[in-house]
């Protein structure tokens, strides 16, 4: 696995670091005077990716692809080193600084760094410091350390040896920083912390620059080279930091916040204490007073506090395992790990690798300023607002990758676009009212300055020219009017098809190794009987890849006799974990390639291709949106064999009555990107005895109809549809969920459902899960108490029968929720929000009269400004805050007596760090918070359903009749 590579132009040295078998890093240095590159020439000996001819040239200044070519053509012994599956050892760190009356700004680094803790993958901790721990200091630390770890179910469940804690005292800060940079940073492969780049690393860098000029920052790199990278801080200011080459420095807060969608989909805060508490059940160390006082009066606890921060980050990585997917993508793409957080870098790598493997060259080009143009987004149907019963979600499996594969869309086979430019002229000139994208015209629902894509008007294409290509099977014509060669499989299709196949292989292999081989290993270790059935070829090959010649369980017994079974088990577990992450990595790569290819930084960027991928995806979902209701409308009554197989009978009179009244048996309620939400109530009502059918029977009917008939029918229909366009369909449009009922608002991507069935599982009728999208109850920005209350209210609404008394019943429930909300902990009723651009909007937070803000200051920035202003003018304790994720609430300056005379103000504070003085200076208004976060969102759902609204005081306005 490649950790990093960098070319030193002055020394003409290409340095490549890789992860060795122990998870450490090794460096390879190659003296390269000139790199092989390619240039365009009609008499060239080689084929360029676009079909033109090219030839070799040797260059001093290599393009990124020239470096990749060099690495591809290395000696095999070096290439083998770069292809190892071992993941890097992750070390975590944290710094503490002295604190005076002001916040230790990392950009200034005025205060000394007091301690630095480093945790290893085994959770061993070293703390660097400049004070004596005192007698028995390390022993006492070890005792507290073990007690802390043993109190965690997550840690004890890891079954690792009890780690140690070690303390190293330095004579001064200078020596401590020198040791940290040279002996820690330069030697570890990956170093991560929490907010570690914008605070810890920036602070260390500026501390060294400002106070210790004899320490070279380049000593933090194993070959003493650095790379400059640009970041934006919480105030919106751009900063440039030097990052060592060959040590990957990560911010685990960023990794968890941006790349985890599984372990914690909802994150109210990105504070270390919150994430650790919610994910691994562990907390930062609590202490009385402030941290500076702790440093001065209880240094042992101060060191312990610092050590635990590093341990928490280490354990969070073990819980989330987000980096495993990044590592696997890096290995598959033959790219350095740090680049694999970028979809664009991954997509470039996949295309380059494909062309290289097929003997096709890539002529480097300079990055040009390209106007991106307008990318048409995914199809989202305007919902039919209201409450709908028995709604199915049918969705496409991997819609965008499948569209690329089906339609053979790629970068090198695009012939051209055939737009009727003459017909488009009046629309292009009328930018206030229209937006032109390729050959498509849309209404502009925005303004001239800020256009916004509105209703589709029409395509304006050169149909006569396109028809020639439509009749020729060697071409594919997109719905947008682009023409692609279709005489063979092209790169994008081939890459996506390979990723899809690899995903299935990795998924199956991981499950088989776990279920078959690992089970046999456990039985042998436990001295249980085993069946000596030979293993399948794929399992034998997998074990051969990790160095074992195992063909059957008896070979495992031989390993037991040789004392190697435990080593084999550990190696097998690593292989299972690799294949599990491999399956996920293939999925992520397949889905991210479309996003990467639609960005101007993509080497082969072409907006026509990006829009064709989206356009074909939109087209097929539109096609199914029309086909399913039409097919059932025309055929349902006559599908006698299907009725028999489902064990039902259709009441023909009822069926005809339904068609006459509604026009269809099924109704499309909503469409979203790759899914259609279809109500089957009309179809059910057409059955004999539908009035007495149980919910279990209704679910069984809908599931049977889809999985036993419609899924395959849809597949066959799409095959025929695409065959008429000269391509082979790999699309699958299948049943995903069946819902008891659901509520849709009159805006896109806002709904809630109660599920009866999902992906083959029928839920117990007394314990039905909810599926919610876009509503406040699943938004991490909403208070915890509000989310929980809204879920209970919406569940009651969806499960209850709509009748003339529903408003009264809901009112009772609402008042119960209000009582619960008013008793909740303060932090649980506060919203969560990120704050940026503080200095852009806050003119002064020290003015003695009031907070000075710029016009149109966002409420969240104002809330944080109020925190700083109240603290500053009243000389109150606490650190200044200028950005990041915070909690917020409404309050009335001057108290409740001023409530009727003014709008509420906003106040913000850090999660789990509420300042007690706010009780006096900014007391929360629970009434306002309840109205804003519970009552108003629930009323919006009730309005969509058409049953009126509720009031905070519990009163109901009833009609006269």
State what each model feature region is.
Residues 676-709:
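Catalytic palm subdomain of template-directed nucleic-acid polymerases
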Residues 290-432, 528-529, 537, 544, ...:
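Common nucleic-acid-contacting/processivity interface regions adjacent to the catalytic cores
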Residues 186-204, 249, 253-347:
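Acidic, Mg2+-coordinating catalytic module of metal-dependent nucleases/exonucleases
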Residues 212-243, 566, 570-573, 633-663, ...:
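Short mixed-charge
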Residues 129-266, 274:
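Conserved DEDDh/DEDDy metal-dependent 3′-5′ exonuclease domain
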Residues 19, 703-961:
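C-terminal, non-catalytic extensions of nucleic-acid polymerases
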Residues 1-186, 213, 307-308, 312-331, ...:
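DnaQ-like (DEDDh/DEDDy) 3′-5′ exonuclease domain used for proofreading
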Residues 154-169, 236-245, 448-492, 530-585, ...:
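Intrinsically disordered, low-complexity acidic Ser/Thr-rich regulatory segments
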